[in-house]
A protein has these predicted regions:
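Repetitive, compositionally biased segments used for assembly/scaffolding
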Residues: 2-119
């Protein structure tokens, strides 16, 4: 899974599960702040990846990345979400709390952490 796809999933999962607008992320693996925003209303996600200048979103469980022209599934389950990135062919699981998203990328076989800035 691309690093920007992990960030997109983290922002979308947080918006879906916590119910607040995401105004940015800090990617611990990359060591940098990401310009990414996301919100969810009535099971519909809308987001913007400012670093790539592209939108993403869709009606759950399907999200579409306008930049990569690919679909990613996102299925909420309590305080976590799971899904599949069709571009990479890999699954993921995300654990979400008020200010943190931890995402396990099965393609990389490891965890990634994102601090969340709430709008």
């Amino acid at each position: 899974m691309h690093s920007h796809t992990r960030a997109l999933v983290a922002a979308a999962a947080h918006a879906v599960l916590i119910g607040k607008k995401v105004a940015g992320l800090y990617d611990h693996d990359a060591g940098k702040h990401l310009r990414i925003a996301s919100e969810c209303r009535d099971h519909r996600v809308q987001g913007l990846d400012g670093d790539r200048a592209v939108g993403f979103g869709g009606r759950l469980p399907e999200l579409y990345d306008d930049g990569d022209k690919s679909f990613i599934s996102l299925e909420p389950d309590g305080a976590s979400a799971r899904g599949f990135d069709r571009m990479s062919g890999h699954a993921y699981v995300a654990q979400v709390s008020e200010r943190l998203v931890q995402l396990y990328d099965h393609g990389e076989n490891r965890w990634f952490a994102f601090d969340v800035q709430i709008a």
